[in-house]
Each structure stands twice: as C-alpha cells, then as structure tokens.
Regions:
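Loop-helix junctions at membrane interfaces
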Residues: 1-169
Length: 169
C-alpha cells in the first residue's frame, strides 16, 4: 500500500514538472502575441489542464513555476504578480472527478477569467500607477477565452482516450 502511494506521488511530481515545462515553453514562445501591457499566450490552457489532472498542491506548483519562469524569461517585472495570479486560478478546478471536462471545471473557467483580469489590472496599477491599466482587460479576456477553448478541446480528447483512468488511477 505504501509503495502504491509513493508511486502515485512520484507520478504527480513528474506530471507537475512536465506541466511546468510545457507551461513555460508555450507561454514564452508559442504564439506569443505582445499587447500594450503584456502578451497573449496559450500557456493558461495547460494550467487549466494541470488543475484538472493533478491534486491542488501539484497544480499550484506547476502553474506558479511554469508561468513564473515564462515571465522571468520574457517580462521579469510581472513574475511576482504572475506567480500569485496563476496560483489562484487553479483553485476552483478539481482533479477528483473521473473526467477532465466536467461541470465544475467548466464553471471554474469563469473565476479564472475574473482572477486573471482583476489580478493583472491591480498589478498594473501597483507597478505603474497607470490609469490606463483597464485597457489590459480586453486582451486578458481574449487570452482566457482562447485558452478556455483549447483546454476544452484538449480535455475532451484526453477524456476520450481515457487518460485519467490509464495514467492517474
């Protein structure tokens, strides 16, 4: 029994590390579109997947490390805000269901959108004191919406393949 638990924890650690690496690369370089106050990327879709597959501490680590490293490479001033915001957006998701795409995880996309928009708005105000920080809300909405769509597509594909049952059970 202890060996099975240790194996499961090892799988979670390895998957969290893989997700952190994927999040870093996809955020920093794959379809990296600059905006006035930041950039649009597809890394959040993998944060949503990590949050739907891994227990909470592992999902938080994958999101914080992956997104934090991406910002350290591309926009270092945002690292602290990003680590906090990305850690928070995983909280409403669950990995306890049999499927990645379930009602709770679909609803979790709404608080993820709110936390992203409000979090980066506040960070922009704190960092730059700019009243134009509200202009960054629209690119953040576009980013979260695009990432949500990719998350659903990937999640449905992984569910159809029985990924959770084969790898995590």
């Amino acid at each position: 029994m202890a060996k099975k638990k240790a194996n499961k924890q090892l799988i979670y650690v390895v998957m969290a590390a893989l997700f952190a690496a994927i999040i870093t690369v996809v955020t920093a370089s794959v379809l990296h579109i600059p905006t006035g106050n930041g950039y649009i990327h597809l890394g959040d879709s993998f944060i949503f997947l990590a949050a739907s597959l891994l227990p909470l501490p592992y999902a938080i680590a994958a999101a914080a490390v992956g997104a934090g490293l991406a910002d350290a490479l591309t926009a270092p001033i945002w690292v602290i805000a990003t680590v906090i915001i990305k850690s928070l957006i995983v909280l409403p998701f669950t990995s306890k269901k049999d499927k990645i795409i379930n009602a709770r995880n679909l609803i979790a996309l709404i608080p993820a959108l709110i936390v992203t928009c409000v979090g980066y708005y506040l960070a922009d105000r704190i960092l730059f004191g700019a009243w134009d920080a509200f202009a960054a809300v629209i690119p953040n909405v576009i980013q979260v919406a695009a990432n949500a769509a990719i998350y659903v597509i990937f999640g449905l594909a992984l569910d159809a393949a029985g990924f959770k049952k084969k790898v995590l059970k």
